[in-house]
């Protein structure tokens, strides 16, 4: 059997001597580290899209996008607009939470024009025939410095008349 080096004291280094409870602290910290990936797999930190649907006499608006995201995440928001009667000047107005500290990578199909309305993003979609579904996709990336909760209200207008409003909240984790 090999001789124990002079600098190793078995009672202290192998048996933990007076620090026997320290092993439970180390195991507890290791357990906490292991919990984070499990919570991510259970979608606690987001990424899976949630669908919100709002309906009125004139139109139905559906939004499918994650409500919880992490910094650096790439994701897509889908807006489905189905008018029950023709919309002459369809406009989608997005609250500041749709653009604040989020990078818009692409928007398809491109709106006919974009405007700013008191910090909100207005997307002019043009006319939409009754019964026809207009689908708008916006691809995002979450800026790493963005943390916290943001209002992501969406309102569908026909001209100056608000048709449908959906209230959503986006939670951004570090």
Locations of the language-model features?
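Short extracytoplasmic
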Residues: 57-96
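A eukaryote-biased signal for short, well-structured alpha-helical docking elements
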Residues: 2-4, 12-56
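Short aromatic-acidic-glycine turn motif
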Residues: 97-114, 161-162
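Short beta-strand edge segments in extracellular beta-sheet folds
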Residues: 169-174
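Hydrophobic beta-strand positions in extracellular immunoglobulin-like domains
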Residues: 81-83, 140, 156
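Low-complexity, intrinsically disordered segments enriched in Ser/Thr together with acidic residues
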Residues: 129-147
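Extracellular adhesion/glycan-binding regions together with long Ser/Thr-
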Residues: 117-131
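Serine/threonine-enriched low-complexity regions used as flexible
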Residues: 146-160
């Amino acid at each position: 059997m090999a001789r124990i080096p002079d600098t190793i004291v078995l009672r202290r280094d192998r048996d933990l001597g007076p620090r026997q409870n320290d092993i439970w602290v180390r195991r507890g910290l290791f357990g906490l580290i292991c919990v984070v990936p499990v919570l991510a797999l259970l979608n606690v930190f987001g990424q899976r899209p949630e669908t919100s649907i709002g309906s009125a006499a004139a139109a139905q608006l559906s939004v499918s996008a994650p409500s919880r995201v992490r910094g650096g995440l790439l994701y897509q928001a889908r807006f489905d607009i189905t008018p029950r009667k023709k919309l002459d000047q369809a406009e989608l107005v997005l609250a500041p939470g749709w653009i604040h500290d989020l990078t818009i990578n692409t928007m398809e199909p491109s709106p006919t024009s974009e405007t700013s309305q008191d910090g909100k993003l207005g997307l002019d979609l043009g006319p939409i025939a009754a019964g026809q579904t207009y689908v708008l996709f916006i691809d995002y990336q979450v800026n790493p410095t963005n943390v916290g909760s943001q209002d992501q209200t969406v309102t569908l207008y026909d001209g100056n008349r608000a048709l449908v409003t959906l209230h959503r909240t986006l939670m951004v984790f570090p």
